[in-house]
C-alpha cells in the first residue's frame, strides 16, 4: 500500500497515468494489484487515486495562491466541472467556496 501511494503521488499531475502504468511500475499484474488493494482498502484504486488528487488540490487551494483552474490542472483533472463536482462530494464545499475561505 505504501509503494502504491508513493507511485500515485508521484503521478498526481499526470492526467494520462493509468492503472496499467501503475502495474508496470510495481511489477504486478492488474489482477494481483486489484486483489491486494481491495484486501487492505474499501476503495478501488481509481477512487483512491481520485481522493489523493482531491486532497492535493485542497492543499494547493489553501496554501499556494493557485486559483481553482490551476489547482485542478496541477492535480490531473482536465474537466473543471468534474473536478468541482468531485470536490464538493469529497469536502462538502465547491472549490470556489473553499478557495474564498483561504
Give the location of each predicted region.
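Short coil turns linking two alpha-helices in DNA-binding domains
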Residues: 29-30, 78-79
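Non-catalytic interaction/regulatory modules that flank or connect domains
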Residues: 17, 23-28
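Core residues of bacterial helix-turn-helix
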Residues: 25-26, 37, 75-76, 87
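Alpha-helical residues within helix-turn-helix
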Residues: 20-21, 32, 70
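Short hydrophobic/aromatic patch on the recognition helix
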Residues: 32-33, 82-83, 87
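…primarily DNA-binding HTH/wHTH and HhH modules…
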Residues: 85-102
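Terminal helix-turn-helix DNA-binding modules in bacterial transcription factors
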Residues: 39-78, 100-102
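Basic, amphipathic alpha-helical hairpins
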Residues: 5-17, 37, 41, 58-67, ...
Amino acid at each position: 500500500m505504501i509503494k502504491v501511494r508513493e507511485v500515485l503521488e508521484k503521478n498526481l499531475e499526470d492526467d494520462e497515468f493509468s492503472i496499467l502504468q501503475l502495474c508496470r511500475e510495481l511489477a504486478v499484474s492488474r489482477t494481483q494489484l486489484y486483489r491486494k488493494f481491495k484486501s487492505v482498502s474499501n476503495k478501488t484504486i481509481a477512487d483512491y487515486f481520485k481522493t489523493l488528487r482531491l486532497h492535493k488540490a485542497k492543499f494547493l487551494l489553501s496554501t499556494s495562491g493557485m486559483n481553482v483552474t490551476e489547482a485542478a490542472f496541477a492535480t490531473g483533472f482536465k474537466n473543471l466541472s468534474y473536478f468541482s463536482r468531485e470536490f464538493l462530494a469529497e469536502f462538502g464545499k465547491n472549490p470556489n467556496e473553499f478557495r474564498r475561505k483561504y
